[in-house]
Structure formats: C-alpha cells, structure tokens
Amino acid sequence: MGKNIIEKIWDKHVVYQEEGKPDLLYIDLHLIHEVTSPQAFEGLRMNGRQVRRPDLSFATMDHNVPTKNLPTIHDPIARNQIETLAKNAEEFGVELAGMGHPDQGIVHVIGPELGLTQPGKTIVCGDSHTSTHGAFGAIAFGIGTSEVEHVLSTQTLWQNKPKTMEIRVEGELSVGVAAKDIILAIIAKFGIGVGTGYIVEFTGEAIHKLSMEERMTICNMSIEAGAKAGLISPDQITVDYIRGRKYAPQGEQFEEAANYWLSLASDEDATYDTVRIIHAEEIEPIITWGTNPSMGTGVSGHVPTLADYKDESDKAALQKALDYMGLEEGQPLTSIDIQHVFIGSCTNSRMSDLRAAANVIKGRKVHGDVTAIVVPGSYSTKKQAEAEGLDKIFIDAGFEWRESGCSMCLAMNDDVVPAGERCASTSNRNFEGRQGAGSRTHLVSPPMAAAAAIAGHFVDVREFVKETV
C-alpha cells in the first residue's frame, strides 16, 4: 500500500519512537519572531545552554513593528520585545532580518520568499499560522514558547502523530473566485473543528491549478479548520517557485533536491483516515458575517436566521454573534456597510494578492466613509510592488501604502479598528476584539476587500470583473 505525503515526511523525521508515547521529531527549520521567543531564550540563558543549530534557525520582527512613522515604536512592551529579539539573536548566533533589513517581513511570507521553506521539511514557529509553509509539501505547525525553547536546545520536539485527512477540491473555480474563498468555503461547509487531531492534505484539480502564493493562503488557514497542519504535495509549480531563491540549493544540488521533492507527492494508492470533498464550481466569493471563520457564506447570500438552526446551542451561538457584530437575522451580506479595509497579513499580502486587489481598484476611488490600508507582507514584496507601480494605483485610489508587518491582523501594534466599526479584512481570524476592542471583522479575499473599499459596503467583485473584461 502506498503512502501519503504526511506519512512520508513524518516517518523520515522520527528520531526516537516508543509504543504508546509521542514521537521525537527532528526539526529542519525553526522560524522565530519577537513575541513568543523572549522567554525561550531566557530559559537557555538560565540553564547555560546554547542554540543547538543556529544554522537551522531564522528570526524576524513582524507582529509589533509599526507600518508607518518608522522607526518609532510607542508601546513600551512592543519596543522591549523587538529590542530583546535583536539582543538574543546576536548573543545566540541566530540570523535576524530585523527592522530595516531587506529581508524583513512577516515570518510566513519571508520564509518562502527566501527559499528557506522547502518540500519535505519539518518546520516550526511560535505562531499558529506556521501551517502556511505546508503549501510547499512540508509538515509545518505552530508551537508554544516552552516548545520554542526545546527546539532551540535540541532541534527536536515530542509530538503525537496526528491522523491524516484528505480535503479534495474537485473541478475548476469560477471567474472572480479566489484561493481565500476556497478555504473559507471549506471551513464554512465542514466547520472549525473538522481538522482537529489531523494533518490535512489539500488535493484536487482546483488546488493544483493554484500558484504557490495561492496555495499558501489555503494552508495558512488550515489551522482555522482545527487542523494541526495543512499541506499540498509538491509539483513542478513548487519546484519552479523555489528555483534561484536565496537559501535554496543551487546548480546540481537543486536538481537533486527537486527530484527528491517531487518523490514526496502522495502515492496514487495512498489512503487517509478521513476524506472530505468539496466542488470548486459551487464556491462563490465568501464573506464571514460572524465571530469565527466558519460563520461565512457566499456574497449572494444573507446572514442566517434562528429558524435555520435546530440545535439550541447553535441558535445561542448565532444570537451571540449577531449581537456582537450588530447584524440582523436574514440581512443580505451586500447591505453591510464597512468603515475600514485591510489588505495584508500572512494570509493575503503577497504579490499576487496585491495585483488582484489593484486590478479592482485601478481607476476607481475609495468610498468617502472608508479608511483603507495596504500592508505588503515583506520589504521585498513592497519594493517589487512599487517597481510595478501598484503603490501608485492604491495611493491614487485613496489607500494608505504602508511598510511591511502583521499590522491590522491583530491588535498588537498601532493599526487597530475602533470599537463598533467594521473592517473588510484579508486576514485569517474574525474573533471578538481580534482587530481591536469591540472591532467587527469580516474576512474576505483581496479582490472582495478592494471592491468593498470602493462601494463602502460589500459587493460581488464578479460585477467588477465583468466591467473590466
């Protein structure tokens, strides 16, 4: 019987195994940022330890960094975390892309950009959206601060082997439907707990037609489906993306690596513990209306009603979400006004995301009641976008063009949504207070966010696509 890619990678990385106990896994790449690492480095210091493999560790600053008025950091906690990471990286010999460095950016954007992320690797970071790197055919997952210290000390991690799940996206996407819509549709259909206890492989025609950046969006939000990690088997699109990048193998070594990477793809007769199927043709642009990512529906739809649910706990959850979001039962999604638009985050801040949004925005103006910002995912992405003139398109339309960072995805820096106001956001979480105390978050794709910025309320971006054809 054949193996799926999850089994292939996991089995290759087991250092020690004992029946009834977690496996000890070797970790190929440890990504570090300023928020979850200070206590881990302090633990090393207190116990007289060093980083075992600084060459397999890479650090950057992203969560707390300001995206305007650089280099000022007003919050003392944020400033301390950034300064502490710089000191720790220097003391322990870890490479750092700090503020002002040409490689700086959101950790889950720069890993792939730099060629650090490669198929077959085990990748960890003290951040839940480490699953992003699974787009390359890697087992990548977030860890806690104590685990960060363990990896720094030993380059290994104790882990229970998860079950395996295939989520197959059959068919082809319709025009105007984005990768973000695929993953939001999956979560809306199967729920935020569907992946609990599993590593998920995304398969199917619709998945393998996606670019690498689009695949990253899919895997980024596998954690919102409850999964330990999500990944996609590598193919020629994967190989072509990695070729020539800064930390990728070069020359003959690259060709050898590429052959190995392609061999990792799940065998034709591979099996999974669970299989779920969704049809791409049924997916339309999605808008979340509630306070978790499963509370979403197609743009042509409406907010659910209590009558749509039989279970009393589901009715209570709906009512709680409606109260927080300030929405009415049965309200059409296109009737929801917004005050903010955020295009950015580790989910949707790459070049293809910015181009897609700019295509909608070009020649149009941001609605007078909307404050809109674009935050590229890395310094490199920002420079490339500026070379293509995307910054001018956004600025001319009325967007603010910012420096790279996590920004408005989470209320951990200067970019927050005021209480009671709504944001059409390309980020990954719409929990209560995620973008600021009392803020109301609606998750959408970059084109949908751009269209909402123009209209001042949610609209079907496919109407804009028709206008430009």
From Swiss-Prot:
Record's keyword annotation contains Lyase: yes
Enzyme class: lyase
Cofactor binding, note field: Binds 1 [4Fe-4S] cluster per subunit.
Catalytic activity reported: (2R,3S)-3-isopropylmalate = (2S)-2-isopropylmalate
Pfam families: Aconitase (PF00330)
EC number(s) from the headed UniProt entry: 4.2.1.33
Pathway involvement of the protein, from the record: Amino-acid biosynthesis; L-leucine biosynthesis; L-leucine from 3-methyl-2-oxobutanoate: step 2/4
Keywords, comma-separated and alphabetical: 4Fe-4S, Amino-acid biosynthesis, Branched-chain amino acid biosynthesis, Iron, Iron-sulfur, Leucine biosynthesis, Lyase, Metal-binding
Family: Belongs to the aconitase/IPM isomerase family. LeuC type 1 subfamily.
Subunit record text: Heterodimer of LeuC and LeuD.
Name of protein: 3-isopropylmalate dehydratase large subunit
Biological source species: Lysinibacillus sphaericus (strain C3-41)
Gene giving rise to this polypeptide: leuC
